[in-house]
Amino acid sequence: MASTKISTDYLIVGSGAVGMAFADTLLTDTDADIVIVDRHHKPGGHWNVAYPFVTLHQPSSFYGVSSRELSTGKLDEIGLNKGLGSLASGATVSAYFDSVMRERFLPSGRVRYFPMSEYYGEGRFTSLVSGKEFEVTARLKHVDATYLKTTVPSTHIPRFSIGDDVWFMPINDLPKLTSTPEGFVVIGGGKTGIDACLWLLENGVEPDAIRWIMPRDAWMIDRRNTQSDIAFFNDTIGAQAAQFEAIANATSIDDLFERLEDSGVLLRLDPAVKPRMFHGATITQAELNELRRIQSVIRMGRVEKIEADQITLEGGTIPTGPNIVHVDCSASAITNLHTKPIFQGDLITPQTVRSYQPVFSASLIAHVEATRETEQEKNQLCGVVPLPNLDTDWITMMIPFMMNQYQWSRDPELREWLSHNRLDGFSGMVRNIDKNDEEKQAILQRMRDSAMPAMAKLQTFVSELEKAS
């Protein structure tokens, strides 16, 4: 079958959140023609196969694409997120991206979208439905919006063996239960494991009926400190100031994490257990209190094998039974932790340029692509902030994060753009405070006073980590 030849300015591979945020800003800032290729049947990437009760872990007010609001603008009035900015459900997010494609991208006449297509590289892809083959020539750039390689429970293959008589399911299948199990074993200590435990508790499962296998405890972020509404200025920007002060005053790495916890920047499940993981999960104090009701937290390493009567872990075995549901939450949300320059010749590889903010990062990268000339300048403004995994990655992540913020603050055009980009969430908050508001100005002064000492201390700690590795 002969290939259909297509010519465009930008070929974007992936219509997940990153690809959509990048394309949206490119549409706003340029007159470019865009081709988007994705293997899913509609935009949204992993949201197409997310578990039914998933929600955002961050406020809806700064998720999605820059040109269209996702948030209702209201605070949640019930539930464990009560009093904070609403968290869009998975269904809402999926519908949002679909409407962005149908109501903004395609009507522009500058976007051609090829869903249900397998991309092979070098501009070649095939429709999984019709079998038609296509070859795309990108006049300007290829954009790999799949580089972060998001994985989800429904498509994840566990790294442990499972016996034939084991009642085992991904988190997606929990709402499909038709009979009451004797108990539940939740496998995985990350965001998905948290969601599974909270869902079970919300649906009336007694805490004693839940065992939570947690290979590593995690540091978590208080969601109250991530709100973009000016009413939360003292929490959000105050946490930034407290963070810089904790770094600057820390006498050791252990002391740093103690200070971060004491100041409310970081949270942990059990005060007696030192976390060894940091993935940037956000949580409310109410959610944390709910999770602490679960007393049977298994800290014996990763699961190696599940049989009908026992679970084998790295550190030993625990009993189980055929009437106990084993819920797989062991998939890592993002599996590619390696970094590379974002701008390389005719290839753009979106990665995070602000800690755990991939959609904001994609939007900023697109704006820099549209408004800057040289590759050197583009990469200088878009230093990669590595995705964290270990607890100490919080430290190594902070240096490029602070460097990027410094670079952006010195660029008047970029400062203006940031203050009007809904995905930023925070620049506008800072810019719009009253100069006569002494309380808020004092918080900003704390940040300014601590920034340089904090950067110096971070570099000291990074040197210690490098020597120890």
Residue ranges and their predicted role:
Residues 77-153, 280, 287-313, 451, ...:
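Feature captures the FAD/FMN-dependent oxidoreductase FAD-binding
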